[in-house]
């Protein structure tokens, strides 16, 4: 998916746009035990509560692709016949009315997702009549020809508040208010199926993590039977290690500056052109910069091997995830290179 498609779905999470009729939830304690489960009718909730639930669901697909959001892709074999894909399809096709499937998902999540706090699993099913867009990008409601049916899951830590003094307007005095347990912004979330090219893609899902340094591998394995992408927060450090370990004594200030200049130019050009497709670089593109810097063939061969080991063969990495430091730092066995990226 691309950011524009995610934003189109996020705009639905308002009372006047959403087709969500029920909210399904499960409260899980820190020991992974299911404390309680519930189903709420949106139409019977006070307006304020409806807004709060929609806000928490919306935040489960917040951020940008390549940072807090990433695509998960199922294999053809999984889509054809696998327990994990079959469960997601049961949830989606039933609009979460299949109670056994919902319970199974709760148990999978509780058994694989370990947070520091208790947490609340929120589930919702939505049906989106996708408006037709003409070639010039204008939206035409009457031209809608397809419906996108999907489920959304937001998993929110439940935190204990501190005692505070609150104002009692009847008495005109302040009194202590005890502790409460409140649902915080989602830590993890997903949407299934994917909304690729503004259409249903049963081979994909959208995955969200608030913490860009943690991909919650056990959770992804339990629910999707997939390997999660490398966390965005880990990619820069991994790239630094690949360069320094592979190039060794050839990892000079000039090489470091040239690599980062090339990556930054790609990011700036992508922003200026306002391209919709996510920006990504391959090993070959980074390798071309290293060759231009005069890196020797043996070191290039070592770089190719270490890059593929770290990121995967044929992988594409958002270049902005490889940048971001105010001061670049590369360590070799004999020296630490610190470079101002703007110089």
Regions found by a protein language model. Give the residues of each.
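Long, hydrophobic alpha/beta structural blocks
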Residues: 3-19, 24-331, 338
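Hydrophobic, glycine-enriched assembly/anchoring segments
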Residues: 342-343
């Amino acid at each position: 998916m691309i950011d524009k498609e995610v934003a189109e779905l996020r705009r639905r999470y308002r009372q006047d746009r959403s087709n969500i009729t029920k909210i399904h939830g499960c409260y899980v304690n820190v020991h992974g035990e299911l404390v309680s489960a519930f189903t709420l009718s949106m139409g019977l909730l006070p307006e304020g509560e409806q807004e709060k639930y929609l806000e928490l669901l919306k935040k489960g697909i917040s951020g940008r692709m390549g940072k807090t959001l990433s695509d998960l892709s199922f294999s053809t074999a999984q889509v054809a016949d696998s327990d994990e894909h079959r469960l997601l399809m049961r949830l989606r096709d039933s609009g979460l009315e299949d109670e056994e499937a919902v319970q199974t998902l709760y148990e999978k999540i509780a058994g694989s997702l370990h947070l520091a706090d208790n947490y609340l699993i929120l589930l919702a099913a939505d049906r989106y009549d996708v408006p037709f867009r003409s070639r010039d990008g204008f939206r035409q409601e009457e031209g809608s020809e397809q419906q996108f049916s999907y489920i959304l899951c937001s998993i929110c830590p439940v935190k204990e508040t501190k005692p505070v003094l609150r104002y009692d307007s009847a008495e005109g005095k302040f009194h202590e208010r005890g502790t409460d347990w409140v649902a915080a912004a989602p830590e993890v979330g997903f949407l299934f199926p994917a909304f690729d090219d503004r259409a249903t893609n049963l081979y994909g899902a959208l995955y969200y993590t608030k913490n860009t340094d943690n991909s919650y591998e056990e959770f992804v394995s339990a629910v999707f039977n997939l390997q999660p992408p490398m966390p965005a927060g880990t990619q820069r450090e991994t790239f630094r290690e690949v360069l320094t370990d592979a190039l060794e004594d050839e990892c000079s200030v000039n090489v470091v500056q040239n690599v980062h200049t090339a990556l930054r130019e790609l990011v700036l050009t992508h922003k200026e052109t306002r391209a919709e497709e996510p920006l990504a670089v391959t090993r070959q593109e980074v390798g071309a910069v290293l060759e231009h810097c005069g890196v020797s063939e043996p070191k290039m061969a070592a770089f190719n091997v270490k890059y593929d080991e770290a990121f995967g063969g044929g992988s594409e990495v958002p270049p902005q995830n490889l940048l971001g430091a105010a001061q670049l730092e590369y360590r070799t066995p004999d020296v630490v290179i610190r470079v101002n990226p703007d110089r």
